[in-house]
A protein has these predicted regions:
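Secreted, disulfide-rich extracellular signaling modules
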Residues: 2-6, 10-11, 18-396
Length: 396
């Protein structure tokens, strides 16, 4: 009798315990330790978490990045400078009259910004000799801020005026050099022993250009992409031969637009990014930060978008270059709200807080895969918002 009663009581006890486990735990606070269950929320709508937001331009040259930009779109202008390598030291006796034909060869890429009606881009351009030294560190202002005459010979040595088809694989653009171009090449052959005085050529878009087109060039450390090439057919000692010079120095120079005052812009090519200052003084000294979200609205009507989709991801990183890489974050685009939202900035704010900073600065920029391969612009109107979910740790 007592044995059966004991078994029955045990079964009832198990049933009671099992029924008590059927309720799912609450998702709010379930991941937090017992001493951190008093959660608090700070919102930038109530507390001045965002101290300031502004656009800044980074002086980052577009040198051997894999893409060259050439053309015009609105007030944006893109030029190309090329310096050629592998000029042999055996052609000093070749004159301009010995050069039968000289052709600059460029490989178009699929990307274009501007008018692409009819499946082609209209990017007429001229080729000019460069008359002074330029390095991979050069930017637009260091070359053209005071006009073209200080950097370029204003007499063109070749020109292109035909539409360039927009295809995944387009025929190369081949530009014949004129007699002045032949004379320039003969001068290069004579100067080969002092190649520092060979400054290369510039490709300058005509005012009638209606788009900016991308062309291929070498990426640093990668030799697979086609290079701009100068093909020279010449006669020497009664024989005709061909010389091919590769564009070892290839750089784009983009004149930034002057309409950025008071605007928040992200734009590759001209390297616009946004700097945001976050105030931390509203957080208790021993706060534990659990979640931080930044909401970034966009103005799609003010976008400049080429023939590729605009970037759906933004990169957020601390302005302090000494900060660890793991605290970087990303924001993804939500079409329903026309905004980007971060996954979490908790690690970044926790880093600032642990280093006793009352203000932290973060940079919003485009991801690396589009930073040098496009000229698209993303416009951010005022109205960024931030929320911080935190708890207070027990006082010691």
């Amino acid at each position: 009798m007592w044995h059966r009663t004991g078994i029955l009581c045990a079964c009832i006890g198990v049933a009671v315990v099992a029924s008590g486990c059927n309720d799912l735990p609450s998702s709010i606070g379930a991941e937090f330790l017992p001493d951190t269950t008093q959660l608090q929320v700070l919102s930038s709508e109530l507390v001045p978490l965002i101290e300031s937001v502004r656009t800044e331009q980074v002086a980052q040259p577009l040198f051997n990045t894999g893409w060259l930009f050439l053309g015009r779109y609105r007030e944006l202008e893109a030029r190309v400078l090329l310096r050629f390598v592998d000029i042999p030291d055996t052609l000093a006796g070749v004159t301009a009259e010995d050069i039968l034909e000289a052709t600059l060869i460029l490989s178009p890429e699929r990307y274009a910004l501007g008018d692409t009606a009819g499946g082609a881009t209209v990017v007429p351009f001229r080729i000019h000799p460069v008359v002074r030294f330029w390095s991979p560190l050069a930017i637009w202002d260091s070359l053209f801020a005071n006009g073209d005459a200080a950097t370029l010979d204003l007499t063109p040595i070749g020109s292109w005026n035909d539409p360039i088809p927009l295809r995944d694989s387009s025929e190369p653009v081949r530009v014949r050099l004129n007699a002045a171009g032949h004379a320039l090449l003969a001068e290069w052959f004579r100067r080969q022993a002092d190649s520092q005085s060979i400054y290369g050529v510039a490709l300058v878009p005509e005012p009638t250009a209606t788009s900016i087109r991308a062309f291929a060039t070498q990426t640093i450390g990668q030799l697979q992409r086609p290079l701009p090439t100068l093909e020279v057919l010449y006669r020497r000692a009664g024989r005709v031969d061909t010389l091919r010079l590769s564009g070892g120095y290839a750089s784009s120079f983009v004149r930034p637009p002057a309409d950025t005052a008071g605007k928040l812009l992200l734009q590759s090519g001209v390297q616009y990014r946004v700097r945001l200052r976050v105030r931390l003084d509203a957080l208790p000294p021993l706060a534990a930060i659990h979640q931080v979200q930044l909401w970034i609205p966009v103005d799609t009507a003010a976008f400049w978008t080429g023939n590729r989709e605009f970037s759906r991801v933004l990169r957020l990183m601390p302005a302090d270059s000494a900060a660890p890489g793991y605290i970087q974050a990303t924001a993804t685009y939500d079409a329903a709200t026309a905004s980007y939202a971060t996954k979490s900035l908790a690690a970044m704010l926790e880093f600032w807080l642990r280093h006793r900073r009352s203000v932290g600065e973060l940079l919003i920029t485009l991801p690396a895969d589009v930073l040098y391969s496009r000229l698209d612009r993303i416009a951010l109107p005022p109205g960024m918002r931030m929320w911080i979910l935190y708890s207070e740790r027990k006082q010691p």
